[in-house]
């Protein structure tokens, strides 16, 4: 090796130099500087942006050393590469092949010995046999993860690491500031203890600040060379808004426009990554992008699965390239819930060009090579500047390429976050990174691990621990306290249940493991916390609780019984919280908290918050020209600049000042219930606002006696205060002495939800909550329960190490208390001012803070109409307009409420009518002048004239003329009428009533507005004889004063309307009450009315062959008795049904039928299928006792095509009689193996064996031998209708259970409308409701359906499409308003339109035999209620206690079927188990008999008969 300081490659061997110069033009600056430091043996931190060759910079020197022919053979690993991501580890292993293969080829070209360098990967995905192989034959280069390194160091595998010379830590910035990083730091120190000489450490990092902190993390106390060449990375960033006004949207949502624009961008580029900040948003975006792309391309989206998602989702939502036959699609999803295999497939598809786009969360943020990505799209501001750089850096990943990124804000205030992120990305001004200090739980875990294999000297271990950066300042007292914890020296006997893991001999200072310590460390080790969900169940006193959904652990800790939460489309009130579940009851229409899933997100850092505030303050001070120029520099495109300018202008108009880094705003306003909302507007982020909210909560309790939990977010704090009549607090609520704030927060955090969840994680990390079964995760509920029990004890001992650690984690890692203290200092020093304002409605920034309450509107249409309207009315409409665009109240207000309220205000209701002269006087005083006709409408008597004469004589009411009419006016109004509209004062009016008012016309119009519902300018002008312009000016002035509201309120009025502010509140409150009644679950009777109609029963619109095809599509795959198909099921749905229609569909190949089991000798179960989707609705053929005849028939049909029965005799069994062959064929038909191209054979079987020659079930003789040649003589005699037509093999059922489950979920949603556990059970779906629940939950995430409590008594896990729920609720009243009489329908008991015995249980009040969904049985429903159940032929009838009118309606419907020939005859022999002829007739049976006799049945010796 030659050394040349001027040449970066001069230190490498000739082989390596030749390969590099052949493959690359020149080293990058990062590579050149790194090789200089690494070749000197220095610990080195290489900081460079994505695409600068960092990985090769770290590896090439080590590879060159390994390729040296003179090196001594080693029995262990020499290069250890540690990656925070398993996927990144695999990616690096793949990329290492290039230099290894290249150097080998160069050696071979020169005739030199080829270097033999082995590479291995060990992670959680590595099979045990490969792990054992690596222990036996360690690779030269081992690629692993922090967790796998820990396991190797705590097992015999550590011996393979004793020869390590180089450790490379990739993406070091991703772990340095976390406990996972602290865990890795101790692992590296433990590794050094195994080595003769500490290994050289090389860290690879994206841009970080400060570099010295990451270098300290990497090497601890050892010196480190920092390689950080000037960043040559160029970013092309833009912020785009696709609409001109984000506050006035055509679709009430910005998402449709954003989605269309994203598709434009993706289609204009070769390869794109779309980043979203949540998994649910990623799923929905993927769905919509594919749908839009398909619509543009004219592609029909098929149903298929998304196998990479747990439970899956339709292929057209997020399938890749060719997914189960689906056409090429635009995007697939990539996030933590996607399986590792499918994530790899998505990555490979994008790299290879088979996929145009991936929609991802942070799962693609780190350095995985995604190939030639040329565009990154970020939806809403990224979580941090560093995250933004990482994400956009995915585009133009190669050296020297430009990274192009487009950001789409989700609402107006998100524009500010996007702008500041872009600004700081351009300057590289990222957030400060801080290494955690002294995490005692990590220390405890490693202490058990290090002592597990051999005794350890405590002093030596303490020194090793302190060499790592996270523990550099660890006090000996904390170390000893941790050893006490692990060795069983507890502060109280209450901790006796904690099992000591070590023996600590304080005399010798030796730590020795107790039995099981090593197993505990390897089965429960690691720093990544187990975080999970609480299951939510519907509480029931009588039934087993049914599942509703899931909630985030921290949200549960923040909730209490009585709180109302939102899950799916329904609000639920919490009744109980246990260790593993949350019990709820429906709270229809109540304002609810939306669930959150925080995970590891801790909010905006304080320094980024200061930048946001400074930016906002700066922009607010600029004139428009300077403003535009400033925005242009930040890449604002489209309508982004106008929207941001409008937002800041409106905020300044609302509060007088825009919140900034030096100005906080405390805004107060009343909500819809009259309570106060007090909002602190501050940009400093959740890490500052979270601890401040704790202190504010304490102040509310101590000073005001209010137990209210303020809500903190990145942009401020929201406090809700009940109206007590006093002035609500202002800035004083949020200002604390700088010296007292930390003790207050420290005291309060111990009782917070955050502390409870972090304590559990710390206790588990410290091995205090070991897994009961090695290799398996403990159920989280069990871990929570044990953690809660431990916390109950530990709270009493503040010095308990895990209590200290949980508090430290909350105060240092999650919260930023120092930044909060600094803010309090600034306030005290007047460097930060607080402005108090009181507003009538929320300011734009306040609207954004309250955004969580209306988040559901962002995907409008996801929820049923009543839920959307109720939620909207529960909010301030100005808030809705600010966030979502103009929302007209006419879309929300109930027209019936508007009409009834207007009638009340106008005294047009009976209870408000005038009953005497005094009542008339009150009318005139309250409503103003009225004509005599007006008064007559408002009186209960006819002697109005006498009453008016009396009032006139007493000079209490006077006739006046204006607007072309004569009016009666109260004498008190004469002055107003004179001064307001020029009415002359009648003679004799006392002077006291003619005094002038300050605003006479305003008073007149104000009263007019207060006494009616919405009205127009024209109506006002006509009422008072004014010009329209004059009326408009007065109304506008009153609106400015807040007395009137301008908008569109009533559907029967056109154009601009007005409404008194207080009247509008009444209308909203009453409409909300009405809507909440609608939001309540419908009764089971309503569902039973809905389902037949949903399935077209009784429809007059379903006709002809197309109508029949529609019906079959809905009923696809469901078994129905053949006897009911053409007598009841099809004719009741298709108005003009004829058997020829079905035969035509079968003959054309559009539809096919299959058998699903024989019923006796003359009936069987059949199902119908659309040919295109038949494999998804067919079941696998049933197992029968196959004979040679069966096999030959199947073999013949298996060749393809269709065969007449006569043709089937060829190749069958020699000597087989026609009857025997027919018998075998029908057995295959009923078993679901064979089908025909006509339904005629089934009809023939139904008509009976004597006429059709259909096979009877009998014992078969042993079949004769199989013949290999044609046996043409085996023929049937004549033409047998039971085997007419052509026969073919049914296509194979789709073997993939996931594919079937997804299609089945879609199919059952379409069949049942509201899908419940009972409905799925009745269908006999493989895997039952549990299987479909996973699929339906994924549909919900993708916006394909809603989960809610739509039908009472059917459990909380009900799924439906929003529009279906709207239709269901139209059956709330006694259904059909055009058919007020009883509506009866008789169905086959097996008909899918019969909800009883499926979604609904059978009534239990019958003392006779139990009803069931049996072939031949009938049910009679009257307005959805089950009235009768009749066994086949009607011989036994069960009645369920309906009134006489309902019984008569049922009897009429039943006899109509007999008359129409749908059922052949009717003979009722028993009613409720008692013979009809029994003379002892009770009241109920008498009602039934009367109904039947009245419908035309006659008494016979056997019973009641109708022919």
Curated annotation (Swiss-Prot):
E.C. designation(s): 3.2.2.27, 5.6.2.-, 5.6.2.4
Region feature Domain 4, mapped onto this chain: 530-856
Site (Forms salt bridge clamp with R-280) residue list: 550
Name of this protein: Lhr helicase/ probable uracil glycosylase
Induction summary: Induced by treatment with mitomycin C (MMC) (at protein level).
Function recorded in the entry: A 3'-5' helicase involved in repair of at least 3 types of DNA cross-links, mitomycin C (MMC), cisplatin, and psoralen-UVA. Translocates 3'-to-5' on single-stranded (ss)DNA, unwinding any encountered duplex nucleic acid. A 3'-ssDNA loading strand of at least 15 nucleotides is required for helicase activity. An RNA:DNA hybrid with a 3'-ssDNA loading strand is an 8-fold better helicase substrate than 3'-tailed double-stranded (ds)DNA; substrates where the helicase loads on a 3'-ssRNA tail (DNA:RNA and RNA:RNA) are not unwound.
Motif extent (DEAH box): 170-173
Renumbered residue ranges of the record's region Lhr-Core: 1-856
Site positions per UniProt: Wedges between bases of the loading strand: 528
Outcome (variant: residue 145 to A): Nearly complete loss of RNA:DNA unwinding, decreased ATPase and strand displacement on a biotinylated substrate
Effect of substituting residue 550 to A: Decreased RNA:DNA unwinding, wild-type ATPase
GO MF: ATP binding; ATP hydrolysis activity; DNA binding; helicase activity; metal ion binding
Cofactor: Ca(2+)
Cofactor details (free text): ssDNA-dependent ATPase is most efficient with Ca(2+); Mn(2+) and Mn(2+) are 60% less effective.
């Amino acid at each position: 090796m030659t050394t040349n300081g001027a040449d970066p490659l001069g230190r490498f061997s000739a082989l390596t130099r030749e390969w590099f110069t052949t493959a690359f033009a020149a080293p990058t600056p990062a590579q050149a500087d790194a090789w200089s430091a690494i070749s000197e043996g220095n610990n080195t931190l290489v900081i460079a942006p994505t695409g600068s060759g960092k990985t090769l910079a770290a590896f090439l020197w080590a590879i060159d050393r390994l390729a040296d022919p003179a090196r001594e053979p080693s029995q262990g690993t020499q290069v250890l590469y540690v990656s925070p991501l398993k996927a990144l580890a695999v990616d690096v292993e793949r990329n290492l092949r290039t230099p290894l293969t290249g150097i080998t080829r160069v050696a071979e070209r020169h005739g030199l010995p080829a270097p033999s360098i082995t590479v291995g990967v060990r992670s959680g995905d590595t099979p045990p046999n490969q792990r054992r192989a690596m222990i036996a034959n360690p690779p030269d280069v081992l690629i692993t993860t922090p967790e796998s390194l820990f396991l190797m160091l705590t097992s015999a595998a550590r011996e393979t690491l004793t020869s390590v010379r180089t450790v490379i830590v990739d993406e070091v910035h991703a772990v340095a500031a976390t406990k996972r990083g602290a865990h890795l730091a101790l692992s590296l120190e433990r590794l050094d203890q195994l080595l003769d000489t500490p290994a050289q450490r090389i860290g690879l990092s994206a841009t970080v600040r400060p570099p010295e902190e990451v270098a300290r993390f990497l090497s601890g106390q050892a010196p480190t060379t920092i390689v950080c060449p000037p960043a040559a990375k160029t970013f092309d960033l833009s912020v785009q808004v696709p609409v001109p006004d984000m506050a006035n949207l055509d679709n009430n949502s910005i998402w449709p426009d954003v989605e269309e624009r994203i598709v434009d961008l993706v289609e204009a580029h070769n390869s794109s990554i779309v980043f979203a900040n949540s998994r649910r948003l990623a799923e929905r975006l993927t769905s919509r992008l594919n749908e839009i792309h398909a619509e543009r391309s004219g592609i029909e989206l098929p149903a298929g699965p998304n196998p990479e998602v747990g439970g899956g989702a339709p292929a057209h939502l997020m399938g890749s390239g060719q997914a189960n036959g689906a056409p090429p699609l635009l995007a697939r999803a990539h996030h933590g819930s996607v399986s590792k295999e499918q994530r790899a497939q998505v990555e490979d598809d994008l790299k290879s060009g088979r996929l145009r786009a991936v929609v991802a969360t942070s799962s693609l943020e780190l350095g995985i090579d995604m190939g030639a990505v040329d565009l990154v799209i970020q939806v809403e501001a990224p979580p941090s500047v560093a995250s933004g750089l990482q994400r956009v850096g995915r585009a133009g990943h190669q050296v020297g390429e430009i990274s192009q990124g487009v950001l789409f804000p989700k609402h107006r205030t998100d524009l500010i976050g996007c702008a500041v992120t872009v600004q700081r990305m351009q300057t590289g001004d990222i957030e400060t990174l801080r290494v955690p200090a002294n995490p005692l739980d990590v220390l405890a875990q490693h202490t058990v691990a290090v002592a597990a294999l051999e005794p350890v000297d405590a002093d030596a271990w303490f020194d090793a621990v302190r060499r790592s950066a996270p523990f550099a300042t660890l006090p000996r007292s904390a170390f000893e306290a941790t050893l006490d914890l692990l060795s069983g020296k507890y502060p109280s006997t209450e901790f006796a249940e904690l099992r000591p893991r070590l023996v600590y001999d304080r005399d010798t200072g030796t730590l020795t493991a107790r039995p099981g310590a090593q197993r505990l460390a390897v089965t429960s080790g690691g720093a990544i916390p187990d975080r999970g969900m609480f299951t939510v169940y519907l509480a029931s006193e009588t039934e087993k609780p049914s599942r509703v959904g899931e909630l985030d652990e921290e949200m549960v800790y923040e909730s209490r019984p009585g709180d109302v939460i939102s899950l799916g489309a329904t609000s639920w009130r919490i009744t109980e919280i246990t260790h593993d579940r949350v019990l709820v009851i429906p709270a229809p229409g109540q304002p609810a908290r939306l669930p959150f899933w925080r995970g590891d997100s801790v909010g905006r850092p304080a320094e980024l918050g200061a930048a946001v505030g400074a930016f906002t303050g700066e922009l607010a001070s600029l004139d428009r020209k300077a403003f535009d120029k400033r925005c242009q520099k930040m890449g604002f495109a489209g309508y982004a600049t106008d929207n941001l300018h409008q937002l800041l202008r409106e905020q300044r108009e609302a509060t007088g000042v825009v919140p900034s880094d030096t100005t906080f705003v405390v805004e107060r306003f009343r909500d819809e219930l009259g309570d106060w909302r007090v909002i602190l507007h501050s940009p400093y982020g959740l890490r500052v606002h979270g601890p401040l909210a704790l202190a504010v909560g304490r102040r509310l309790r101590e000073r005001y006696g209010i137990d209210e939990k303020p809500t903190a977010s990145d942009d401020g704090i929201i406090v809700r205060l009940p109206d007590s009549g006093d002035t609500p607090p202002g800035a004083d609520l949020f200002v604390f002495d700088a010296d007292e704030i930390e003790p207050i927060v420290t005291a309060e955090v111990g009782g917070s939800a955050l502390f409870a969840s972090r304590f559990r994680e710390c206790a588990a990390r410290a091995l205090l909550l070991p897994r009961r079964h090695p290799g398996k995760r403990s159920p989280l509920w069990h871990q929570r329960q044990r953690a809660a029990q431990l916390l109950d004890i530990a709270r009493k001992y503040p010095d308990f190490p895990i209590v200290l650690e949980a508090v430290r984690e909350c105060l240092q890692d999650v919260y930023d208390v120092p930044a909060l203290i600094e803010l309090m200092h600034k306030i005290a020093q007047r460097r930060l001012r607080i402005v108090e304002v009181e507003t009538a409605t929320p300011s734009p920034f306040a609207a954004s803070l309250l955004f969580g309450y209306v988040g559901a509107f962002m995907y409008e249409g996801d929820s049923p109409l009543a839920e959307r309207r109720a939620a909207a009315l529960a909010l301030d409409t100005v808030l809705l307009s600010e966030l979502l665009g103009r929302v007209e109240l006419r879309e929300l207000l109930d027209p019936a409420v508007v009409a009834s309220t207007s009638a009340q205000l106008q005294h047009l209701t009976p209870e408000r009518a005038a009953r005497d002269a005094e009542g008339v006087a009150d009318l005139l005083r309250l409503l103003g002048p009225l004509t005599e006709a007006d008064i007559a409408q408002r009186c209960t008597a006819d002697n109005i004239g006498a009453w008016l004469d009396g009032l006139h004589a007493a000079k209490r009411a006077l006739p006046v003329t204006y607007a072309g009419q004569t009016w009666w006016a109260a004498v008190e109004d004469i002055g107003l009428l004179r001064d307001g509209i020029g009415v002359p004062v009648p003679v004799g009016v006392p002077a006291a009533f003619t005094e002038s008012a300050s605003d006479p016309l305003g008073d007149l119009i104000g009263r007019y507005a207060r006494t009616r519902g919405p009205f127009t300018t024209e109506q006002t002008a006509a009422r008072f004889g004014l010009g329209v312009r004059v009326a408009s000016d007065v109304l506008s002035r009153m609106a400015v004063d807040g007395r009137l509201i301008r908008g569109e309120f009533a559907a029967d009025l056109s154009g601009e309307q007005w409404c008194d502010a207080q009247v509008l509140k009444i209308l909203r409150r009453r409409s909300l009450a009405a809507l909440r009644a609608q939001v309540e679950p419908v009764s089971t009777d309503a569902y039973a009315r809905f389902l037949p109609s949903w399935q077209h029963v009784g429809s007059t619109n379903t006709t002809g062959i197309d109508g029949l095809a529609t019906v079959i599509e809905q009923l696809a795959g469901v078994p129905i008795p053949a006897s009911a198909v053409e007598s009841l099921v099809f004719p009741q749905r298709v108005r003009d049904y004829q058997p020829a229609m079905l035969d035509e569909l079968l003959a054309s190949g559009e539809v096919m039928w299959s058998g699903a089991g024989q019923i006796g000798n003359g009936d069987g179960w059949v199902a119908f299928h659309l040919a295109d989707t038949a494999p998804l609705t067919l079941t696998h053929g049933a197992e029968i006792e196959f004979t040679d005849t069966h096999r030959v028939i199947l073999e013949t049909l298996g060749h393809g095509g269709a065969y007449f029965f006569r043709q089937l005799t060829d190749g069958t069994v020699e000597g087989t009689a026609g009857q025997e062959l027919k018998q075998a064929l029908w057995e295959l038909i009923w078993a679901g193996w064979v089908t025909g191209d006509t339904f005629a054979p089934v009809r023939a079987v139904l008509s009976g064996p004597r006429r059709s020659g259909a096979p009877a079930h009998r014992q078969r003789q042993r079949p004769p031998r199989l013949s290999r040649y044609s046996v043409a003589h085996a023929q049937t005699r004549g033409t047998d209708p039971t085997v007419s037509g052509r026969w073919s093999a049914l296509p194979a059922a789709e073997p993939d259970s996931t594919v079937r489950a997804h299609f089945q979920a879609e199919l059952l949603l379409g069949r049942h409308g509201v899908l419940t556990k009972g409905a799925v059970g009745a269908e006999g779906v493989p895997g039952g409701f549990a299987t479909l629940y996973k699929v339906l939950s994924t549909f919900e995430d993708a916006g394909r359906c809603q989960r809610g409590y739509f039908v009472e008594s059917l459990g909380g896990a009900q799924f439906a499409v929003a529009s279906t729920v709207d239709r269901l609720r139209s059956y709330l009243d006694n259904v059909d308003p055009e058919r007020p009489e009883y509506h009866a329908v008789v169905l086959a008991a097996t008909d899918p339109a019969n909800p009883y015995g499926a979604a609904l249980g059978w009534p239990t009040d019958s003392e006779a035999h139990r009803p069931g969904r049996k072939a031949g049985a009938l049910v009679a429903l009257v307005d959805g209620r089950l009235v009768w159940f009749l066994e086949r032929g009607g011989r036994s009838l069960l009645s369920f206690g309906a009134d006489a009118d309902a019984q008569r309606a049922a009897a009429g419907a039943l006899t109509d079927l007999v008359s129409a020939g749908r059922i052949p005859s009717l003979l009722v022999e028993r009613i409720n188990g008692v013979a009809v002829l029994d003379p002892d007739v009770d009241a109920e049976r008498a009602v039934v008999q009367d109904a039947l006799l009245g419908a035309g049945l006659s008494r016979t010796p056997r019973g009641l008969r109708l022919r």
